[in-house]
Amino acid sequence: MKNKYDFKLVEEKRNEKWQKKGFFIAPKQTKKPFSIISPPPNVTGQLHLGHSWNAFIQDSLVRYHKLQGFDVLLLPSVDHAGIATQVKVEEDLAKKGIKKSDLKREEFIKKCYHWKEKQYLKIKEQWDKLGICYDFSKERFTLDQDAQIAVSDFFIKLWEKNLIYRGQKAINWDIKLQTAISNIEVINKPVEQKMYYLKYFLENSNEFLTVATTRIETISSDVALAINPKDKRYLHLVGKKVVHPLTKKLIIIIADSNVSSDFGSGIMKVSAHSILDFEIMEKHNLESKDCIDNYGNLNHEVPEFQGQNRFFARDLIAKKLEKEGFLAKIETVISNVGFSQRSDEIVEILKKPQWFVKMDELAKSLISHLNSKDKIKFYPKNFEKNLRKWFEKIHDWTISRQLWWGHRIPVWCKNDEFKVQIDSPGQGWIQDEDVLDTWFSSGISAFAFLGWPQNFDLIKSYFPTSLLVTGWDILFFWVARMYFSSLFIMKQKPFEKVLLHGLIRDEIGRKMSKSLGNGLDPMEIIEKYGSDTLRQALIFNSSPGKDIKFNIEKLNTAWNLNNKIWNIAKYIADLDTFFAKPDLIDLWMENKIYILKRQIVKNIKKYNFSVIGTEINNFIYGDFSSRYIELIKTRKNGFYARKLLRKVLIILHPFLPFLTDFLMEKIFKMEILEQKMPRIRQFKENQKVENILEIIDNLRTYREKFQISKKIILEYCIINDKFSNAEIDIINKLTFGKWLENKELVIKTKNFEIAIKVPEELKKEQKGRELKEIQFLKSEILRAEKILTNKGFLEKAPREKIDLERTKLEKLKEKLAFYEKK
């Protein structure tokens, strides 16, 4: 073995070996199962640090359960990522001078599949470097043939239960991507903008009402003013009419409980391009008219400003209204504005025909399950509350997207008739042009990836899956949808437990991103430090629901631990191996391994990986390296030490798979993944070894404190206890000491009194130091006495200063007397 840990030597082709030997091909289940369906990364790019963290957690848990004797399944997959992939492909085509509109739909889809294949090869290469134990015989793609059958079947089953409908409703519209998006794909951000205070004159009156709005560009779609029915200031105006400032038409004043009396003047203009406004219009049977088109420009409803960008038009409209006396004032405010998560464009609210999932019944089913004993267990628990609150206020889900790349909606139209089925009903029937939201397809992955609705073999063995590991940021996007989809189709929960981890941030707490330039490429880290180092740096800093502040120091710490394990293994491997029974030290070490294993088993159940990391670090650096290896240096035989090393490698394997696999193969000629988690004896007579260590520590501390050379034999004895000759021999060898009955210098430790014969060299040094101290004290006393006999000082100095000098003189004399007596 090399003198230093070489991760490239250790990790080269090791995952390839695991795959060839089929260590992680899920067997026909005969033992207790442990299964995880891995969150599918998008085929839009490379894996980032967050993907690596997630994959490492899953892989470590699967390896742990395999060593515990479980039948394991870690199923890999990738997501077609509808909008994101289509944008990437369009950008790629644009570089070649090709527009999407230049291609037929089928041609564009082929381009998307070609893109997917290239990206998937890159992702698989990255998985290989990470060392993830996927069962690639069962890998899935959210747009493969089986997935298309499953998604269509799911859609039809929802339709048959009247849980899917097509309706013209206010939806979130991405003007850049030209598609509808769901509510949770809208991110609210604080934006500085202008608040316009508009004058609405009462019919046939010089009196006016002031209405505050940040969206002056929607004024032409105003159909009413609304006040809260509890607002006594305006209640007498309900039913009256006001003059529209722009069109000069009359619009009515209504009362609605959704109006906030605290916002602006407490009067709200009811117009298109707001979901709340649309709801009020429907409730009061008011006609709605859009004034903004699909591209974010003003339409024919505003002839004077038609074609103007919605935001540019704000100033134009404000100037016109000010000129005509309908603008009271303008203020600058900061308010939340909805942005598309996909394009970062400000979302527009438009009324459009779309496909929706009715969420009331599905939400009630999920909340009911959360109230049952069979509910999914969330780690940390507070995310269950978050999920419950979200479902209590949920809206219907917009599932149609105006894209080409994705699952086609299984609906066929002919004239005014339509049919919901997978295959075409016949000639003249045209399939709906839209595709389904990506989360609609990934929302059934918990059971569809296992074969539903065509093959139930894996479902019988591994469903519900044991665990889902994912980031808390997609709790509502993905976890929630798998939950209600599984309850609807499978009549049971999709997984037993959900472990939600946080985000990876830089060392000052900022989210890692391209725009900030603080992102780290996991493949570059692996190239420099190795996969085990990255795994350890991420996993051993993980706690459920918590973010990680990542920095290079964490990698250095992890690499040092790997190097320490390497050095321990090399030392033990070089020892003689003739048979020998375990001695007291071996049994003590075995008990330390027992404690480590117990701590890992205890904390892995709670997913407290940071605690596991601390336990492993303390064990390797403390018990194994500083203690056990030091203790066995008193002998040349490593027979039992090798047995203990083998057990440690198996215990550490889930967290350091490459290194432990290499060492097991190199030293023991065994495959670590063919082993079982070792049974370890608990040794109860540990105190004898702890006593030896206590004596060694204190003798070493004494030697270090007084800088006594190792060439000088330290003579000592234990006053209040007896040690065997074998135990004394160990102490002597590890402290360069010798037992000698004496009572010259007694050191009291936690449990003992150690008498040390002070070496002559130290006595001479000590005497020299004391003589110097005496000379110093005498000179200080002389100085103090001169000051205190100085008349000028005594007459001019403050009383406090004189008293201070006298006190100082007394202490100096006491100290001098002590040294002279000594």
UniProtKB/Swiss-Prot annotation:
Swiss-Prot/TrEMBL catalytic activity: tRNA(Val) + L-valine + ATP = L-valyl-tRNA(Val) + AMP + diphosphate
One GO cellular component term noted in the UniProt record for this chain: cytosol
The entry's keywords: Aminoacyl-tRNA synthetase, ATP-binding, Coiled coil, Cytoplasm, Ligase, Nucleotide-binding, Protein biosynthesis
Motif placement: 'HIGH' region: 41-51
Coiled coil: 765-822
EC nos: 6.1.1.9
Matches recorded under PROSITE patterns: AA_TRNA_LIGASE_I
Motif 'KMSKS' region, residue range(s) on this chain: 511-515
Alphabetized InterPro entries for the sequence: aa-tRNA-synth_I_CS, aa-tRNA-synth_Ia, Anticodon_Ia_Val, M/V/L/I-tRNA-synth_anticd-bd, Rossmann-like_a/b/a_fold, tRNA-bd_arm, tRNAsynth_Ia_anticodon-bd, Val-tRNA_synth_C_sf
GO MF term (any one): valine-tRNA ligase activity
Subcellular location field: Cytoplasm
GO biological process: valyl-tRNA aminoacylation
Broad class of where this protein is predominantly found: cytoplasm
Residues annotated as binding ATP: K514
SUPFAM superfamilies: Anticodon-binding domain of a subclass of class I aminoacyl-tRNA synthetases, Nucleotidylyl transferase, tRNA-binding arm, ValRS/IleRS/LeuRS editing domain
Family affiliation: Belongs to the class-I aminoacyl-tRNA synthetase family. ValS type 1 subfamily.
Subunit: Monomer.
Functional note: Catalyzes the attachment of valine to tRNA(Val). As ValRS can inadvertently accommodate and process structurally similar amino acids such as threonine, to avoid such errors, it has a 'posttransfer' editing activity that hydrolyzes mischarged Thr-tRNA(Val) in a tRNA-dependent manner.
The record's note on its domains: ValRS has two distinct active sites: one for aminoacylation and one for editing. The misactivated threonine is translocated from the active site to the editing site. The C-terminal coiled-coil domain is crucial for aminoacylation activity.
PANTHER family per UniProt: VALINE--TRNA LIGASE, CHLOROPLASTIC_MITOCHONDRIAL 2, VALYL-TRNA SYNTHETASES
Name this polypeptide is given: Valine--tRNA ligase
Biological source species: Mesomycoplasma hyopneumoniae (strain 7448)
This protein's encoding gene: valS
